[in-house]
Curated annotation (Swiss-Prot):
It comes from the Bacteria. The keyword Transmembrane applies. The chain crosses the membrane at residues 10-27, 32-54, 64-86, 91-113, 123-145, 157-179, 219-241, 262-284, 288-310, 317-339. Pfam families: Cons_hypoth698 (PF03601). It is found in: Cell membrane. The keyword Cell membrane applies. Keywords: Cell membrane, Membrane, Transmembrane, Transmembrane helix. GO terms for cellular component: plasma membrane. It is a multi-pass membrane protein. The lineage of its organism: Bacteria, Bacillati, Bacillota, Bacilli, Lactobacillales. This is UPF0324 membrane protein LJ_1117. Its main location: membrane. Coiled coil: none annotated. Belongs to the UPF0324 family.
Length: 343
């Protein structure tokens, strides 16, 4: 690892992806563009770098691979500082329970529909987690738990899953803002709907802030309740995938993976959420750590954009987009009902 960090390839890759990541953070603060979110903007900027000469991209390739893997995990760990467990506890058990129902139901429904529509397993799982938990960060957090024999295909699936949650999240953000006056919800109830149904944290913030502080506060608490489920969901999916591989290997008389991959970075995610909650960090320090998380995640997303083959992706997109549209609609309806009944 030290040798690659010292290499020219890593330096070139770091400069390319850092520019994309920082630009994504600043562009995400602009009106309307904020609906997309910093991570997706970084991905799109990474895609734009595919116009660079082939020689430059080939020289950066080892560093790009390192950043897409290691920086992703570092970003997920630091993202834990965004979770304030005390605030989640204050919101009450009903908030966590509703989040659990929404997340689990959406993951199962999106996965089932994706398979029905002909999507491959890995793509169905990643899209389901992105729709159910927290968008691009969930896709990238769950992906390391999925064993794959074809790394290029896996990268294509990651980008396609991110594209799904970006498009669906943006569409449903606008839809929920438009229909809010027709729903008979208080501002706080609408925040619950936005935080419980929209895909990215950026989407929840954009919708919640449209109707004042009460709406925004509710949206953030509900959304972070879903983010809290990232670690357990990734563990469950890793275990489930491992069991499936063992079973398939027994049937095919091939060698199965010997052990479940240990998601140490998810342990770090939980640890940082505990540290951020119970240690007296100044707000400016916590904000800085969360910003650092998005810088590293943005670099990983840009690296993904630089290295992926999009001509293949566009041919396979329809199956998961249809599934995500249906499951996102069901999740929105579920959250409207829950907000009226319990909040």
């Amino acid at each position: 690892m030290i040798s690659i960090v010292k290499s020219k390839s890593f330096g070139l890759a770091a400069v390319m992806t850092l520019i994309c990541s920082v630009a994504g953070i600043f562009l995400a603060k602009l009106p309307y563009v904020n609906l997309i979110g910093a991570l997706v903007i970084a991905l799109l900027l990474g895609i734009s770098l595919q116009v660079l000469p082939v020689g430059v991209r080939e020289e950066a390739a080892p560093g790009i691979g390192f950043i897409s893997n290691k920086f992703l995990r570092l970003g997920i760990i630091l993202l834990g500082f965004r979770l304030n467990l005390t605030k989640l506890a204050d919101a009450g058990i009903k908030t966590i329970l509703v989040a659990m129902l929404g997340v689990s139901g959406t993951i199962v429904l999106t996965y089932w529909l994706s398979k029905k529509f002909g999507a491959e397993d890995e793509l169905a799982v990643l899209s389901a987690c992105g729709c159910g938990i927290c968008g691009a960060a969930a896709v990238m957090g769950v992906s390391p738990q999925i064993e794959s024999r074809d790394e290029e295909r896996k990268r294509e699936n990651e980008v396609l899953a991110v594209a799904v949650v970006c498009v669906m999240g943006t569409v449903f953000t606008l839809l929920e803002i438009v229909i809010k006056p027709m729903l008979g919800l208080t501002d706080s109830q609408f925040g619950i709907v936005a935080g419980g149904s929209l895909h990215e944290i950026a989407h929840a913030i954009a919708a919640g802030s449209a109707f004042g502080e009460a709406s925004l506060d509710s949206a953030l608490i509900m959304k972070l309740s879903r983010v809290l489920l990232l670690a357990p969901v990734a563990l469950i999916i890793g275990y489930w995938y491992q069991r499936r591989l063992v079973k398939e290997s027994a049937q095919d008389h091939t060698q199965a993976p010997k052990k479940l991959p240990i998601p140490w970075f998810l342990g770090g995610f939980i640890l940082t959420s505990i540290l951020g909650t119970f240690l007296p960090f100044p707000p400016v320090v916590l904000d800085g750590l969360v910003q650092a998380a998005y810088v590293f995640l943005g670099m990983a997303m840009a690296a993904l954009g630089i290295s992926v083959n999009f001509s293949v992706i566009f041919k396979r997109g329809g199956t998961v987009f249809g599934a995500a549209a249906i499951s996102s609609t069901c999740l929105m309806i579920f959250m409207i009902i829950m907000s009226k009944l319990f909040f």
